[in-house]
Amino acid sequence: MECDLMETDILESLEDLGYKGPLLEDGALSQAVSAGASSPEFTKLCAWLVSELRVLCKLEENVQATNSPSEAEEFQLEVSGLLGEMNCPYLSLTSGDVTKRLLIQKNCLLLLTYLISELEAARMLCVNAPPKKAQEGGGSEVFQELKGICIALGMSKPPANITMFQFFSGIEKKLKETLAKVPPNHVGKPLLKKPMGPAHWEKIEAINQAIANEYEVRRKLLIKRLDVTVQSFGWSDRAKSQTEKLAKVYQPKRSVLSPKTTISVAHLLAARQDLSKILRTSSGSIREKTACAINKVLMGRVPDRGGRPNEIEPPPPEMPPWQKRQDGPQQQTGGRGGGRGGYEHSSYGGRGGHEQGGGRGGRGGYDHGGRGGGRGNKHQGGWTDGGSGGGGGYQDGGYRDSGFQPGGYHGGHSSGGYQGGGYGGFQTSSSYTGSGYQGGGYQQDNRYQDGGHHGDRGGGRGGRGGRGGRGGRAGQGGGWGGRGSQNYHQGGQFEQHFQHGGYQYNHSGFGQGRHYTS
């Protein structure tokens, strides 16, 4: 695994350094390092790396490539001398038997890694500290360009004592002779006609370099995408058996692709006016050569996925809109519960339910003559003398389903209480202290002593507090069933028991002088 990783790194580095040899092919490097110094291809690669190093570094030692395995020992001796001069830090390459060091695959890979890293470092240093430019006319780049012009035009080698003016005059004369042999518009008119000075050429060079850097990044990206795509083709089991064939077809074409651009300022000078023509890519003449069968395949109808802002509906509200509360169905003789219920045999009766109570008063939970709950009905004819008149819903023990009828009751009513044609009336608060009730105003052991009826109090606190629910009416005495129960004797005497804080009060016949009549 370690050797495979080293081989991959070496191949990538060789491509970056500009190596164009046969070891870039798939599997070639692995085969060469396995043979080591006995492989001529391995020795050629080492010789190329050393030659590139000698251009940038002052090295005395040199390495020559071999042509046969018999020259392996001589090659290893040369490599040993070179590594000693370069102060190689790897002991496996500088110690041990000289004739056997480079016969091991790992040592061969280590040697290539070391030479490649040294060459990369030397080139970096060369870029950061470029050497002085050679004088014009020597072996510089300018001299090479002028030499190429003379060869292209078929000119003979100029004499050594010729001046630059004479030299360029000879080139101009030769160009005119060559252009006279072709049609007038064969070359075309130049695209750049404006004369340029030194400052202009410097700016043009800077612009060209910026564009070259940008397109170099783009070309590297496209080449990397190509490598990854081709590599993905070999993932399938069927393609793994065709790896060698794929490499033979792909590697030659891949090696031609270079991230470096070949466009220079010379191309700007050579540009002609025909390059300024704008051709529509959709024109008929162009599409004749660029059209393919896939362009004729029409895509089927695609459903509209929406998403337009003007078509999006607002989301539903988090809370439903408030609506007016609708009243429930009206019952036949329903209404509000009478008081807070009644008492049956000295029991406390809830809030009183609806049980066909009259008017707005419920039945209140009474036992034949007990107090009616709430605001019971007032039946026509008012209260009866000596009957067990409940909370407006009984007459002589019978129930009359009558509403609130005019005519009132015999004793009428005032803001204080009701006079039932006899006695009772409104009991003032001065007659007793402590309000006469405990925790809700009900009296225990109340008995209607006249007829044996259990006239237990209905509507503990009356309807909703206040005046005892405005509905506590009971007994022939016509007294107000307010807060706290009261026992009535038909003869007009009261025997009441109020329990409040543990105290008991016994009153007989009090409050007889206050009557309310209609």
From Swiss-Prot:
One protein family per Pfam: DUF2465
Record's compositionally biased regions (Basic and acidic residues): 302-311, 447-459
Biased composition (Polar residues): 505-518
Biased composition (Low complexity): 488-504
InterPro entries reported in the protein's UniProt record: FAM98
Residues covered by region (Disordered): 297-415, 434-518
Tissue-level expression: Expressed strongly in colorectal cancer cells. Expressed strongly in colorectal cancer tissues compared to wild-type colon samples (at protein level). Expressed strongly in colorectal cancer tissues compared to wild-type colon samples.
Gly residues composition-biased segments: 349-364, 383-396, 405-415, 460-484
A molecular-function term among this protein's GO annotations: protein methyltransferase activity
Biological process according to GO: lysosome localization; positive regulation of cell population proliferation; positive regulation of gene expression; positive regulation of ruffle assembly; protein methylation; tRNA splicing, via endonucleolytic cleavage and ligation
Role this protein plays: Positively stimulates PRMT1-induced protein arginine methylation. Involved in skeletal homeostasis. Positively regulates lysosome peripheral distribution and ruffled border formation in osteoclasts.
Protein name: Protein FAM98A
Gene responsible for this protein: FAM98A
